[in-house]
Amino acid sequence: MPEVINRAMALTGTFEDISFAELLQLLNVSHKSGKLSCWRGTERAELHILGGEVARAVSRRERGPEVVYRVLGWKTGEFSF
């Protein structure tokens, strides 16, 4: 289960506990803003969330919606918001 670290909505967890799609839905419904870092092995993705919407997404190889689509396919990995 994801762990809330403090009142500033620091949230960490694994995609085994909550899927990337569920995490995006949680951030959207709660209109959160911040940086969502995702990683799996050597793969990294960084998403900037503004009012619950993905405003920017980057990885080492891609930018934009392709990053979101790639991470949607991850069944394992970790995240921090």
Where do the model's predicted regions map?
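Acidic, Ser/Thr/Pro-enriched low-complexity segments and adjacent helix/loop capping patches
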Residues: 1-81
